[in-house]
From Swiss-Prot:
Lineage, highest ranks first: Bacteria, Pseudomonadati, Pseudomonadota, Gammaproteobacteria, Pasteurellales
Note: The HgaI modification system consists of two cytosine methylase genes responsible for modification of different strands in the target DNA.
The EC number(s) this enzyme carries: 2.1.1.37
Domain spans labelled SAM-dependent MTase C5-type: 3-358
Family: Belongs to the class I-like SAM-binding methyltransferase superfamily. C5-methyltransferase family.
Catalytic activity of the protein: a 2'-deoxycytidine in DNA + S-adenosyl-L-methionine = a 5-methyl-2'-deoxycytidine in DNA + S-adenosyl-L-homocysteine + H(+)
Protein name: Type II methyltransferase M2.HgaI
Keywords: DNA-binding, Methyltransferase, Restriction system, S-adenosyl-L-methionine, Transferase
Cross-referenced PANTHER family: CYTOSINE-SPECIFIC METHYLTRANSFERASE (PTHR10629), DNA (CYTOSINE-5)-METHYLTRANSFERASE 1 (PTHR10629:SF52)
Keyword field contains Transferase: yes
Catalytic center residues: C81
InterPro entries given in the database record: C5-Methyltransferase (IPR050390), C5_DNA_meth_AS (IPR018117), C5_MeTfrase (IPR001525), SAM-dependent_MTases_sf (IPR029063)
Domain of life: Bacteria
Length: 358
C-alpha cells in the first residue's frame, strides 16, 4: 500500500534517491534555495515543490493545505542544525533565543501538530540532539521537548546510526529521530559488515590531477604541482602536513600549516571518511585517494576522489544524471549536505520491507 509522504528542508533530494522506489509516495516537498528546489524537481517531477522560506506563514499554509488534501501520513525533515551548544551566560544568548527563526525545528512541530501523521523521521548531524532549544521558558534538549509534546501519541526513538554499518563505504554518523503511532512496528535496520575502499573503488583505474578518463564521472580536478609532489610522497592514512621533506608549500616556499587530517590520504582497508561539502578540496579533511605504491617509492593518485568514486562511497547510482549546467562543486556540495541514500532507505524500509501502518 502506498503511503503519501512529504519532505521538509529537502535540499536537492539526494538523500531521497532510494526512497521513491519504495511504497512512500512523496507528494509535497519544501526547500528554501531555488537551485536546490529545481534539482529536487529534476529528480522527482511528480512531487509538488513549494520553494521558499518555511517560516513564511502564507507559504506554510499552502504546504499544510496540500499535505492535508493529499492525506500525508509520513513526514521527513532535515531542519538546519540550529540551537545552543550549551546553557550558560552569554551576552548574545537572550537575543538569539527570542528569535524563533533561529530554531527551525519548531516549524516541523507545527506540521506534526496539524497533520494526523503516522510516521515522522527527523535526521541531522549527531550534535543536533545535544543542543538546547527554548521551550516554555526553559532551555531543553530536543528529546525532552519531543517527549513533553508527543509521548502520549507517538513512540519516540532517538539513535545515532553510522552509514558504514549499513552497507555503505563511508563513515557518516547521523542522528535519527523516529516517531510513530503506538501499535505500529518500525524497527531499526540490521547492521551489516563494513565495506572497505578497496572493495568499493579498488577496481577503478588511477587518475592524475587534471586527467579526464573515458569512464563517466571518473575525472580528477587539477592541483598545484607543489601539492602534487607532496601528496606523491604521502602514504595511505597519513597527512602530507607531517612529511619531513615533501610537504605542502605556499607559493613563496613557506611550509603550509594545518591540522593532522588536512592533506591526508584515506586508507584502503577502511570505509571512506565522511564526504563533506568540501570533498573536492585536496586540503580539506581526509579527502585524498589512498594511492598505490609505485616502483620509485612514491604513491599514485595525488588527488581527491573523483565524482564517480564519491557516488560509490555515498551509495549513489553510478549512472545518475544531474540538471544541465550543474557544476562539479555544486554536485559535491549537495552530496555533502545529504544523508547517504542507502542509509535513509534502510531506516525507512528496514531489511528491504515496505513501511506499513500494521
Amino acid at each position: 500500500m502506498k503511503i503519501n509522504a512529504m519532505s521538509l528542508f529537502s535540499s536537492a533530494g539526494i538523500g531521497e534517491l532510494d526512497l521513491h522506489k519504495g511504497n512512500l509516495n512523496f507528494v509535497v516537498a519544501n526547500e528554501l534555495l531555488k537551485k536546490r528546489a529545481d534539482t529536487y524537481q529534476f529528480f522527482y517531477p511528480e512531487t509538488k515543490m513549494f520553494q521558499g522560506d518555511i517560516s513564511d506563514e502564507k507559504l506554510k499554509r499552502e504546504i499544510l493545505l496540500s499535505a492535508q488534501q493529499n492525506n500525508v501520513k509520513f513526514l521527513l525533515a532535515t531542519p538546519p542544525c540550529q540551537g545552543l551548544s550549551s546553557v550558560g551566560k552569554n551576552k548574545h544568548q537572550d537575543h538569539f533565543i527570542k528569535d524563533n527563526r533561529n530554531f527551525l525545528i519548531f516549524e516541523v512541530f507545527e506540521f506534526i501538530d496539524v497533520l494526523n501523521l503516522d510516521f515522522i523521521l527527523i535526521e541531522n548531524v549527531p550534535r543536533f540532539i545535544e543542543m538546547y532549544f527554548p521551550y516554555n521558558g526553559q532551555l531543553l534538549l530536543l528529546e525532552e521537548i519531543l517527549k513533553i509534546k508527543y509521548a502520549s501519541k507517538y513512540q519516540i526513538d532517538i539513535v545515532i546510526l553510522n552509514a558504514k554499518d549499513y552497507g555503505i563505504c563511508q563513515s557518516r554518523p547521523r542522528a535519527i529521530i523516529k516517531m510513530y503511532k503506538y501499535g505500529i512496528t518500525w524497527k531499526l535496520p540490521t547492521i551489516q559488515a563494513e565495506i572497505s575502499l578497496q572493495r568499493a573503488i579498488g577496481h577503478l583505474p588511477p587518475l592524475e590531477p587534471g586527467e579526464v578518463s573515458s569512464i563517466k564521472w571518473h575525472s580528477a580536478p587539477n592541483v598545484k604541482p607543489s601539492i602534487i609532489e607532496a601528496i606523491r610522497h604521502t602514504k595511505p592514512g597519513t597527512s602530507a602536513i607531517s612529511n619531513p621533506i615533501f610537504y605542502p608549500k605556499k607559493d613563496n616556499g613557506e611550509r603550509i600549516k594545518g591540522f593532522h587530517n588536512t592533506y591526508k590520504r584515506m586508507e584502503w582497508d577502511k570505509p571512506a571518511p565522511a564526504r563533506t561539502t568540501y570533498s573536492g578540496s585536496i586540503s580539506s579533511h581526509n579527502n585524498i585517494h589512498p594511492g598505490r605504491l609505485q616502483l620509485d617509492g612514491t604513491y599514485s593518485d595525488p588527488r581527491v576522489l573523483s565524482l564517480l568514486e564519491t557516488f560509490i562511497v555515498s551509495s549513489i547510482d553510478e549512472n545518475i544524471e544531474f540538471p544541465p549546467g550543474s557544476s562539479e562543486t555544486y554536485i559535491r556540495t549537495i552530496i555533502g549536505e545529504a544523508i547517504p541514500p542507502k542509509l535513509l532507505s534502510a531506516i525507512c524500509f528496514p531489511d528491504g520491507e515496505n513501511i506499513n501502518v500494521k
